[in-house]
From Swiss-Prot:
Keyword match S-adenosyl-L-methionine: no
Pathway the protein acts in: Mycotoxin biosynthesis; aflatoxin biosynthesis
Protein name: Aflatoxin biosynthesis regulatory protein
Cytoplasm recorded as keyword: no
Length: 444
C-alpha cells in the first residue's frame, strides 16, 4: 500500500510543471485600461502611449489560465461523493485564500500534496466562475458571502492542516448573521436600494419614537382623580376620616366659598356628631390593628383624628368654651350656653347646633337639652378612652423604634420625646374634656 501512495505524494513533477509556466500579461496596458480605450497591444509600448509620451506598462493578469499538466488517472477514478465542491461552497473559505498569487497557489498545492491522503484534492481556480470570486473593489455578490455559512467538508480541512482548519471553522462561525439582515442584503443586491433604505430608516424612526415617547402607566390613565383613592389602604382611610371631621371651612380661610353660605346652615347636630365620632373611632381602631400602625406618619394622623374627635365631643356637650386647648386653664362663664344657640367654640372650628329638641330617640325640652347632650357625650367617652390606651401602646412602640434613629432623621416624623409627648397630650386632653363635662353637670 505504501508503493501505491508514494508516487502521488512526491511533489517533484507538480513543482516542475508549474515553474515552466510563464506568467501571462494583460492584453491592455495600464494607461489604456484606466482610460477605458482600446489598446494596440504592442510590446513593449503601445502606439497610444508612444504618441502621448506615457510610460507603457503591462500588468500581470490575475487569470492564470488552465493548468497545462495532463490530468491524473486518479481523478477519473474518484468517487462522486468526493468530487470537488461547488463554487458557492468554496466561497465559505477565508477571503485570503481567494486572492492568491501564483507563488501562493504553488505553495498551497505543494503543502496539500506533502501530506499523504487517501484522496488528494486540487483546487484549480479556472473552474470557478468569475462573478463568484469576491474582488477587492466590492463588486462581488453580497448574498454569496453569507449564503453558505456551513463549514467546509472534512476532506478539504484535513489537507489544510489542523491549525488552519480550526482557524477556517472559527472564521466561518463568526460570519453567522440574522436572517432578516440577510434578506435585507439580498434585496439590496437585486437593486432594491430604495426599499432597503426605507425599511432601515423606518425601523430606526419607529425605534426613536418608542424611546422618545414617554411611557404612561395604564393604571394612571384609568384611575380616577386623585389617584390615591383607588389605592385603598390605611393611609387613605386615615385621610378620608380626617377629611370627614372637617365638614366646614374655617371662618378666616381665604379659599372659603363666597356663595352666600350661612353660618347656621349645614351645621352639625348632636346626633350627627355622635354618629360621626363612632365611625371615626371604628376606623382608627381598624388602623391600629394593622401592621401599618408602625409607621410614624400614620400614627401622627391617628393622633390628629383622636384630638379632633375630642374637640367635636366637647362642642356637642357645650363645654368647649370653658376649656381651652390641652394644658390650658379653664375659663368658666366666658360663654353662655343658652338654648337655640350655636356653640361656635370661641375661635375653634367645631360648630354644633343645639336648637333641635330631639337628642337621640328622646324628645326633651329646650331647657333640658344641653344637660341631656352633655350626659350623652359623657357616656360615649369610654370609646375614646379605650382608643387612647391602644394608641399609647403603638406610640410607645414607635418611640422604641425611634430611639435607635438619630434626631431629625427622615425615617420618622418624631423623635423619642415627640412620641411620648403625643401620648401625654392625648391623655391630658381626654381628662380635660371629661372633667369639664362633669363640672358642667354639677353646676346644672
Amino acid at each position: 500500500m505504501v508503493d501505491h501512495i508514494s508516487p502521488r505524494a512526491s511533489p517533484g513533477p507538480i513543482r516542475s510543471s508549474q515553474t515552466r509556466r510563464a506568467r501571462k500579461l494583460r492584453d491592455s496596458c495600464t494607461s489604456c485600461a484606466s482610460s477605458k480605450v482600446r489598446c494596440t497591444k504592442e510590446k513593449p509600448a503601445c502606439a497610444r502611449c508612444i504618441e502621448r509620451g506615457l510610460a507603457c506598462q503591462y500588468m500581470v493578469s490575475k487569470r492564470m489560465g488552465r493548468n497545462p499538466r495532463a490530468p491524473s488517472p486518479l481523478d477519473s477514478t474518484r468517487r462522486p461523493s468526493e468530487s470537488l465542491p461547488s463554487a458557492g461552497s468554496e466561497q465559505g473559505l477565508p477571503a485570503h485564500n481567494t486572492y492568491s498569487t501564483p507563488h501562493a497557489h504553488t505553495q498551497a498545492h505543494t503543502h496539500a500534496h506533502s501530506h499523504p491522503q487517501p484522496h488528494p484534492q486540487s483546487h484549480p481556480q479556472s473552474n470557478q466562475p468569475p462573478h463568484a470570486l469576491p474582488t477587492p473593489n466590492g463588486s462581488s455578490s453580497v448574498s454569496a458571502i453569507f449564503s453558505h455559512q456551513s463549514p467546509p467538508p472534512l476532506v478539504e480541512t484535513q489537507g489544510l492542516g489542523g491549525d488552519l482548519a480550526g482557524q477556517a471553522q472559527s472564521t466561518l462561525s463568526s460570519l453567522t448573521v440574522d436572517s432578516e439582515f440577510g434578506g435585507s442584503l439580498q434585496s439590496m443586491e437585486h437593486g432594491n436600494h430604495a426599499d432597503f433604505l426605507a425599511e432601515s430608516t423606518g425601523s430606526l424612526f419607529d425605534a426613536f419614537l418608542e424611546v422618545g415617547t414617554p411611557m404612561i402607566d395604564p393604571f394612571l390613565e384609568s384611575a380616577p382623580l386623585p389617584p390615591f383613592q383607588a389605592r385603598y389602604c390605611c393611609f387613605s382611610l386615615a385621610l378620608q376620616t380626617l377629611t370627614c371631621l372637617f365638614p366646614h371651612a374655617p371662618l378666616g380661610c381665604q379659599l372659603r366659598l363666597t356663595d352666600g353660605e350661612d353660618s347656621s346652615c349645614n351645621l352639625m347636630t348632636t346626633d350627627m356628631v355622635i354618629s360621626g365620632n363612632k365611625k371615626a373611632t371604628d376606623a382608627v381602631r381598624k388602623i391600629l390593628g394593622c401592621s401599618c400602625a408602625q409607621d410614624g406618619y400614620l400614627l401622627s394622623m391617628v393622633v390628629l383624628i383622636v384630638l379632633k374627635v375630642l374637640g367635636w365631643y366637647a362642642a356637642a356637650a357645650g363645654t368647649q368654651c370653658t376649656s381651652t386647648a390641652a394644658g390650658g386653664e379653664t375659663n368658666s362663664g366666658s360663654c353662655s350656653n343658652s338654648p337655640a344657640t350655636v356653640s361656635s367654640g370661641c375661635l375653634t372650628e367645631e360648630r354644633v347646633l343645639h336648637h333641635p329638641s330631639m337628642v337621640g330617640e328622646d324628645c326633651v325640652d329646650e331647657e333640658d337639652q344641653p344637660r341631656v347632650a352633655a350626659q350623652l357625650v359623657l357616656s360615649e367617652l369610654h370609646r375614646v378612652q379605650s382608643l387612647v390606651n391602644l394608641l399609647a401602646k403603638r406610640l410607645q412602640e414607635g418611640g422604641d423604634d425611634a430611639a435607635g434613629i438619630p434626631a431629625h432623621h427622615p425615617a420618622s416624623p418624631f423623635s423619642l420625646l415627640g412620641f411620648s409627648g403625643l401620648e401625654a397630650n392625648l391623655r391630658h386632653r381626654l381628662r380635660a374634656v371629661s372633667s369639664d363635662i362633669i363640672d358642667y353637670l354639677h353646676r346644672e
